[in-house]
């Protein structure tokens, strides 16, 4: 409560309230975020605790109301300060602030306030300090001089409210006594009206009987929603008679507005239409039937279902079908077996979006490109193709665009690209997972004759998004299988064909549904498992793996902020330098995408979270300075930039924050402690190629490019060839081909003195592909197999810094292979310096980033002899008479 005996200091720090007024006796909660306000609270309240007093001074957006003054820019001692306009309420002046850009209109009168509660917080992730302050208005003051103290203002003030002695003398005034009685009578009448609606006004009635009337005037007015000018007028009312007169007028106005609103409500309720009366009677009849046990809820539910079906916008032929099914349902009892399935079917018909679509906003290609660049780093060609797709949609919205199929390793952003397309088109997005689907019914639905039948995933997805034109992602389309229940890939042929999906027939739905408005996007890790007819209906866009530099940029820009947010941290708690991220990429992850990188970053964040949560120095920063005794709270929000007002619910605690510890900076020691010893080493290739018979190949998998070692050894035997490593038929044939070529050219390769000597005389050859649990197939290991065999027979080691790929023929020609970019990136990840490629793959090098190519020596070859010449230190000299 405002205290007439409070001792007001000569100077007060000034907290500005823009277009809001704090009256004596009122309580507000403010959230200080402005640096100047934060500094004021820090120095004047936080450090002084319960001894601190501040001044709250209204700030105008215009000079329309009240008396104004302009702030000086002098020091706290008053130099350069501006004098208040000697008590003349009508005069006003204005002056630019320090920066000369903004004019601040200060009111000449304010209210001294004390802090009842302080709470300090730190925003994440910025680390900005904020304060939540509960202030109580004490007494009015007049500003005599305003000056600057650092980033905030202070004022020389004089008290305006009466002292205790003056109040005792004024209370004997007959006019004041009459005004007090009139105010209390009006306030009591208001409380009586409010008691009928609110349960909490009893405490207000107690205030009315115990608190002096001159204080009640401010408290009551502070609880009303009135204009800023009226608030200022109340603040300027120093004379008790004037203040009580204005307060009585405002209370009476508030009372009359409540009475008028009640009168209008009663009038409207008394003019119920015939249909409304019938509705009320039916509700009463329903209650009577419930008491008698004669409930017809099911009939009411069927009627509601019929109304829902009428509003679904079904085509005429489907509406006729639905009506027949509805008539059948009405004739059935809820206990009958088919009742539940019929009702579920009709509910599906009513919930499907037959006509409802998402309204597409006008496409802004520039904004779409910026969104793609912001959400996805790199992938230039892929993003360009998406922009082209969106450009065609903008020029011809009804065009049936191609079905895009993003093919690439896991973790390169295939799913998020589809989500970005939906975001650019302002359409809803739905993901249909096809991984492991082997039943055609998952696409077309089950027939209703089966128990537990349900619609297919496409129809069910459309029901969930409630629009007929979403962007639908068919995820992992290469993971579908087939068995006796059918082939889901064949069912997708109808879905992805724009000429057929206009009348898509789900077995459960049993009526045609138009899928032509749906934009389909598919994802896959590999193209090989996708049936050719299905692949022909899609435009394949390959997403290669990321380079180490791209991974670094993605981690710093996207992954680290996301990981910190997911673990409740910020940069003030954990910092991961670029050098450490680079070490994680090089030593702990070797992948095409960034999922393992994110997992390792999450492991570091968890380790930091444990330490932060266990901090012994974690202290509560909330300070309860004085208990809140007032029951009326100002619940309005300040609309200025200095402070933000918020409601304080009765009895609710203000949340506490914790001291901000010094940030934890990740170093190599922490990496090894959290992630363990490095999993990969640049010297791995050199260690494994330390003996003859081992060569380094490059292969492509569904996870991107990889380095594949090939090991060959000889032993006593009968000239047999043994192959291990879970190999497919194609790679087995490549091994047979390689051995045949080496045996035929043994003399030319200086592996035997003459061509008559059999290299396999009394010995067997065993070729092994390490990582035996991983299936391997394809022709691209041909040159690697030849190099391994030549190394074995010549007892020469292959260069450890060289990797190769290429298919070979029986005549020694090197044929082109696929996945060149991913293979080159894999070689770079493993620290390989030289890469041997077929010459006909030179065109594919244009897709490899220039920084990667600059760090590698690319060797293009036409024949296997050139491969051998590059693979061995000092070359592999052939005999001059060599032919073919």
UniProtKB/Swiss-Prot annotation:
The record's SUPFAM superfamilies line, in alphabetical order, gives: P-loop containing nucleoside triphosphate hydrolases, PUA domain-like, Ribosomal protein S5 domain 2-like
Any one GO CC term of this protein is: peroxisomal matrix
Entry binding sites for ATP: 408-415
Gly residues bias spans: 75-89
Principal localisation: other
Molecular function (GO) terms listed? ATP binding; ATP hydrolysis activity; ATP-dependent peptidase activity; serine-type endopeptidase activity
Q: Which UniProt keywords apply?
A: ATP-binding, Hydrolase, Nucleotide-binding, Peroxisome, Protease, Serine protease
Microbody targeting signal (motif): residue ranges:
882-884
Which intervals of the chain are annotated as region Disordered? 67-101
Which regions span the lipid bilayer? none
* Presence of the UniProt keyword Protease in the record: yes
Q: NCBIfam families, per this entry? A: lon
HAMAP family, per this entry? lonp2_euk
The record describes the protein's role as: ATP-dependent serine protease that mediates the selective degradation of misfolded and unassembled polypeptides in the peroxisomal matrix. Necessary for type 2 peroxisome targeting signal (PTS2)-containing protein processing and facilitates peroxisome matrix protein import.
According to UniProt, the name of this protein is: Lon protease homolog 2, peroxisomal
Q: Where does this protein come from, organism-wise?
A: Oryza sativa subsp. japonica
């Amino acid at each position: 409560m405002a205290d007439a005996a409070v001792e007001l200091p000569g100077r007060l720090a000034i907290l500005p309230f823009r277009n809001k007024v704090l009256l004596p006796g009122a309580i507000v909660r403010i959230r200080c975020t402005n640096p100047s306000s934060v500094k004021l609270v820090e120095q004047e309240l936080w450090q002084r605790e319960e001894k601190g007093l501040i001044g709250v001074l209204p700030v105008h957006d215009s000079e329309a109301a009240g008396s104004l003054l302009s702030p000086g820019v002098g020091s706290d001692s008053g130099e350069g300060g501006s004098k208040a306009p000697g008590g003349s309420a009508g005069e006003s002046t204005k002056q630019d602030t320090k920066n000369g850009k903004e004019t601040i209109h200060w009111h000449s009168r304010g209210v001294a306030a004390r802090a009842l509660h302080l709470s300090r917080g730190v925003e994440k992730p910025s680390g900005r300090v904020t304060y939540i302050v509960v202030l109580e208005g004490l007494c009015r003051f007049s500003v005599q001089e305003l000056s600057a103290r650092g980033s905030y203002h202070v004022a020389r003030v004089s008290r305006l409210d009466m002292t205790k002695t003056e109040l005792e003398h004024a209370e004997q005034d007959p006019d004041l006594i009459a005004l007090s009685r009139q105010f209390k009578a009006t306030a009591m009448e208001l409380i009586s009206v409010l008691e009928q609606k609110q349960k909490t006004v009893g405490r207000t009635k107690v205030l009315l009987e115990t608190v002096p009337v001159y204080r009640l005037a401010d408290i009551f007015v502070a609880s009303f929603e009135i204009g800023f000018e009226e608030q200022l007028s109340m603040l300027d009312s120093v004379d008790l008679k004037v203040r009580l007169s204005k307060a009585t007028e405002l209370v009476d106005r508030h009372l009359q507005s409540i009475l008028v609103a009640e009168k209008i409500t009663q009038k409207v309720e008394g003019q119920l239409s015939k249909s409304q009366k019938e509705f009320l009677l039916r509700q009463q009849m329903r209650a009577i039937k419930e008491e008698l046990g004669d409930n017809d809820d099911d009939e009411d539910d069927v009627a509601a279902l019929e109304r829902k079906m009428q509003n679904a916008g079904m085509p005429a032929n489907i509406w006729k079908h639905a009506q027949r099914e509805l008539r059948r349902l009405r004739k059935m009892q809820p206990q009958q077996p088919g009742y539940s399935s019929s009702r579920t079917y009709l509910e599906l018909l009513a919930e499907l979006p037959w006509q409802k679509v998402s309204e597409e906003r006008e496409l802004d290609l520039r904004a779409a490109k910026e969104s793609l660049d912001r959400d996805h780093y790199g992938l230039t060609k892929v993003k360009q193709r998406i922009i082209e797709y969106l450009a065609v949609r903008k020029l011809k919205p009804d065009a049936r665009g191609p079905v895009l199929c993003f093919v690439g390793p896991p973790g390169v952003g295939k799913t998020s690209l589809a989500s970005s397309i939906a975001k650019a088109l302002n359409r809803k997005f739905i993901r249909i997972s096809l991984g492991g689907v082997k039943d055609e019914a998952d696409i077309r639905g089950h027939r209703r004759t089966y128990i537990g039948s349900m619609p297919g995933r496409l129809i069910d997805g459309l029901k969930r998004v409630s629009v007929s034109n979403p962007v639908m992602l068919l995820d992992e389309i290469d993971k579908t299988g087939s068995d006796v229940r059918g082939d889901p890939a064949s069912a997708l042929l109808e879905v992805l064909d724009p000429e057929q999906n206009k009348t898509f027939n789900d077995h459960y739905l049993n009526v045609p549904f138009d899928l032509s408005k749906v934009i389909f996007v598919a994802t896959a890790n590999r193209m090989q498992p996708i049936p050719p007819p299905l692949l022909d209906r899609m435009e394949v866009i390959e997403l290669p793996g990321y380079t180490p530099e791209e991974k670094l940029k993605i981690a710093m820009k996207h992954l680290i902020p996301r990981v910190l947010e997911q673990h409740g941290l910020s940069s003030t708690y954990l910092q991961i330098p670029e050098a450490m991220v680079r070490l994680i990429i090089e030593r702990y992850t070797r992948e095409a995408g960034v999922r393992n990188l994110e997992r390792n970053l999450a492991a570091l964040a968890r380790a930091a979270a444990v330490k932060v949560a266990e901090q012994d120095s974690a202290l509560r920063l909330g300070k309860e300075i004085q208990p809140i005794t007032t029951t009326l709270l100002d619940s309005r929000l300040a609309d200025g930039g200095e402070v933000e007002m918020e409601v304080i619910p009765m009895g609710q605690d203000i949340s506490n924050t914790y001291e901000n510890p010094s940030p934890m900076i990740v170093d190599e020691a922490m990496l090894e402690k959290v992630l363990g010893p490095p999993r990969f080493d640049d010297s791995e290739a050199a260690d494994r190629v330390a003996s003859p018979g081992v060569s380094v190949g490059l292969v492509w998998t569904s996870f991107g490019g990889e380095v594949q070692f090939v090991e060959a050894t000889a032993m006593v035997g009968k000239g047999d060839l043994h192959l291990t490593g879970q190999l497919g038929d194609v790679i087995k044939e490549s091994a047979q081909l390689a051995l045949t070529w080496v045996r035929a050219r043994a003399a030319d390769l200086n592996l035997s003195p003459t061509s008559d000597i059999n290299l396999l005389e009394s010995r067997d050859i065993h070729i092994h592909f390490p990582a035996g649990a991983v299936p391997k197939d394809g022709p691209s290991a041909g040159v690697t197999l030849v190099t391994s065999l030549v190394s074995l027979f010549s007892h020469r080691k292959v260069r450890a810094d060289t990797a190769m790929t290429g298919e070979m023929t029986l005549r020694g020609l090197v044929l082109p292979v696929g996945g060149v970019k991913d293979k080159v990136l894999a070689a770079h990840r493993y620290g390989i310096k030289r890469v041997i490629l077929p010459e006909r793959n030179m065109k594919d090098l244009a897709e490899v980033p220039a920084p990667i190519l600059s760090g590698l020596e690319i060797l293009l070859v036409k024949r296997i002899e050139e491969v051998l010449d590059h693979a061995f230190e000092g070359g592999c000299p052939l005999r001059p008479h060599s032919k073919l």
